[in-house]
Structure formats: structure tokens, C-alpha cells
């Protein structure tokens, strides 16, 4: 099991960062393959809290190689800022342990401007983006006008790419009576960061293939979750990249068989707008929010909270070919008398065992629940299966039956070491 892909199976914020950090102890390389600094991974090591946005979670482990693949939308200023903030905490990030794909499309201020502009134009129909410029950057990539990291090396090529980029963006800005951007402004923005960011530029696809031939253990670290996937998520309330496991190949350049692990919370959360069948706009939701400290790592927005949705997770398992589940934040459920799991939906007299693609239907689905008795016992920080209450074990067994995949690990706190291995992978 040399290659592992780790993906979220809900709407992100499942705790992937901690799990990647935990598993990377026995890995050599960790690769980010999609998303950008709209992702937020929180890791607690020796009571020190680290919040990562672009950097792979293995950056906190000495001797590991961290790679940012071509599928990532790269904000160069954000990356350098994140590196420098870690150095203040004693974490050494350098061009020997961090490599960035030369093909990464760059996020510039013009992308953030466009995202905010169109969110404002959408009024009450906002997607609820992070305003980090991720979507507009991916638009430019698909439109073949993006500036890539490799373009920064050649002044003539860069000038040409900036002209192409501004022809598009300024046409839109003029049409909306928005101030146009001067070429000198974009060039200055890029030149401020070029020297620092280019020191990390590498042919990542080639390095990964060489590392695989050497027998190195590689973890691919997903961002967001399955139902934020641009194709398979709750469209249009999704992110602008593919978040399912197959994107690990496209977004890194390494084509190989991998063992796929899905990470889920013991309940469900979502940031921003969009359908959420099991959302609890009541005391249950308030309790999950308060106990789980459910604020977005990047946006600092309140996460919407609800019961575990086995229909969604089962669908995500199938979309990503998941073989194993890691269950996080079980300790948040300690105080509940009764815990519910969604096992199906009803809509207009019809039963559904999957999430329909239609946005108009998704927002009207009525969840069908199976109830489980709570365990009413403090499980935070527990590290052995023998110490777990019987009702918690029954809850885990119920989840396994409903989603059709074994749960191998559970997490009982944000701390790195608070993990219980239920089964061998």
C-alpha cells in the first residue's frame, strides 16, 4: 500500500488534515492535488495549533517531502506568507522539502476582484465563495489564458500571457463600468514574488514518478469534500475543482493504483449556501456548532450543522472508490441522548436512496432517520477501543452497515495522537 489517496466525503471540514498528518508518519511524500488556499486544514501538535491552507499537512513532519501538484490553483503571495508564518513557529520549509508544480495556474488580485464582483452581482443568489479567487483562476486555466508558474521565468512569455489575460478581464470590467487593470500593475504584483516562488518550481509529475519507482510511500491529500465537487456536488453550490479521488491522478501527474481512504465527521457540517438535507436549525444544530467549535478555518464563518447523512456518504464512497473510512469528531456527540442517521430521502411521494442532481429537488428532500441511543460518556482523548462505550460501538457498526465500507480509524480530539485504530488497513 505505497500510494494512498485521502478525500473528504461530505462538504469539507471532515478533519482530513489531522488524518493526513497522522498517516504521514509512515509515508515519505504528501501531495496536494486540487483546490487552493480556500482549503483549511487544522492540526494540533504538542498543544500548538497549525492552520494550513496551501501547504500539505506533512510539512509539519521533519524529513518528509511536500508537493503541490498542477491541479492546485496557486496564490503565490499566500503560499510565501504561509511558509513564513510556519518558520516563525520553528517549522523549516525550504526548496528541498517543498516542491511546487511548474504547471500550477497562478491566482492574482484580478481573480479576487472578479470573484467578489460576481458574488455581489448575484445578490440573494450568492454561492458563498471564500473570495480567494479560486474559481476565476480555474476559469482562466480552462480558457487557456492563465499565467502558470513556469511563465514567470521568461519575461517575453510573461508579457504575452499578461496581455492575453488582461484582454479578457478588462473587457468584462469595462462592460460592468469597473476600473480596468493596467499591465504594469499585474507585472509589478508578479515581480514582487517571482524570485521567492520560483525557488520551489519543479517538474512535479516527473519527480513523483521517480519517487514511485524508488518505492517511496506517497499520500495524496484532498481538499474540500465530495459534495463540493464541480461535477458530482450540489451544483451550483460547489467549488471549482474536482474533489473526488480520481482527481489525484490529473492534479499530480502520477498515474498509479492507490488505496483510497475517505474521511467523515460523525455528524455533518456545511459552510455557505446550498442544499443540506439533514441540517438542524434547532437546539441540536446549536449544540453541534458549540461543542464542535464549527467555524470555517479559512472563512471564519459559522458552519451549518446536522445529523450524519449515510445516503450522501455512501454515494461519495462509490464516486471515489473508497475502501476505508476514518471517522472524526465522535467526541462531539458525547452529550446526546439520541443520535440520528439519515438512511434515505422522500420527495413528492417518491423515495430516494441517492442524492438527485437537480438543485430544485435537493433543497426539498425530507430525510428519513434511524435512531441510535447516545452514550452519555466523555470519550475525548481516548486511545483504545476497550475504553469506548458500547453504544458508541453500536453507532459505528450502524454507520458501517449503512455506508457499506469498514471504519478503520476514529479520531477522539483534534490532537495528533488521539486516534484509535479499530482494524488494520
UniProtKB/Swiss-Prot annotation:
Q: Which UniProt keywords apply?
A: Cytoplasm, GTP-binding, Ligase, Magnesium, Metal-binding, Nucleotide-binding, Purine biosynthesis
Top-level taxonomic group: Bacteria
Database matches in InterPro entries: Adenylosuccin_syn_GTP-bd, Adenylosuccin_syn_Lys_AS, Adenylosuccinate_synth_dom1, Adenylosuccinate_synth_dom2, Adenylosuccinate_synth_dom3, Adenylosuccinate_synthetase, P-loop_NTPase
Compartment(s) where it occurs, according to its Swiss-Prot or TrEMBL record: Cytoplasm
- EC number in record: 6.3.4.4
> Which Gene3D superfamilies does the protein's record reference?
Adenylosuccinate Synthetase, subunit A, domain 1 (3.40.440.10), Adenylosuccinate Synthetase, subunit A, domain 2 (1.10.300.10), Adenylosuccinate Synthetase, subunit A, domain 3 (3.90.170.10)
Report the enzyme's class at the first EC level: ligase
Task: Look up the record and name the pathway of this protein.
Answer: Purine metabolism; AMP biosynthesis via de novo pathway; AMP from IMP: step 1/2
Q: Any S-S bridges, and between which cysteines? A: none
One GO molecular-function annotation for this sequence? GTP binding
List, separated by semicolons, the cofactors it needs.
Mg(2+)
For binding substrate, which residues are annotated in this chain's numbering?
297-303
* Record-annotated active site: 13, 41
Tell me the residue numbers annotated for binding GTP. Answer: 12-18, 40-42, 303, 329-331, 411-413
Q: Name one GO biological process term.
A: IMP metabolic process
Which residues does the annotation say bind IMP? 13-16, 38-41, 130, 144, 224, 239, 301
UniProt xrefs under Pfam families: Adenylsucc_synt (PF00709)
Q: Subunit composition? A: Homodimer.
Q: Which HAMAP family match?
A: Adenylosucc_synth
The name on file for this protein is: Adenylosuccinate synthetase
Q: Which organism is it from?
A: Wolbachia pipientis wMel
